[in-house]
Amino acid sequence: MRKYVIERDIPKVGTFEREQLRDAAKTSNAALVKLGADIQWVESFVADSKTFCVYLAKDEAVIRRHAEISGFPASKITEVKRMIDPTTAAS
């Protein structure tokens, strides 16, 4: 599977309480169950009015389908080509 970063424009998401975030995660998980093994949610980073979600997926189409089922927008989908970290400097 490929790795993607999905930007989701969600007004005031950074002010959501823990319960609201838990409900959002439950909604996302329910959509993932419907889609099966072609997609996996890794983690999400919450900013003021958007989230940056990391997913493993077969292709971009399954990410768009997840957005449709969950009701969360996929404002921008970017495939991750490579990853680097501080240890990259030593290699």
Regions found by a protein language model. Name each.
Residues 2-8, 52-61:
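A broadly tuned preference for mixed-charge, low-complexity surface segments
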Residues 37-43, 76:
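A short linear hydrophobic-aromatic micro-motif
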Residues 41-54, 61-63:
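Amphipathic, hydrophobic secondary-structure cores in small proteins
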Residues 1-33, 40, 82-91:
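Short S/T/G/P-rich N-terminal loop/turn motif that feeds into the first structured element of a domain
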Residues 29, 51-55, 59, 75, ...:
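Short amphipathic alpha-helical patches
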Residues 56-83:
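An amphipathic, aromatic/His-enriched active-site/gating alpha helix that lines ligand/cofactor pockets
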Residues 24-27, 52, 66:
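Residues within well-formed alpha-helices
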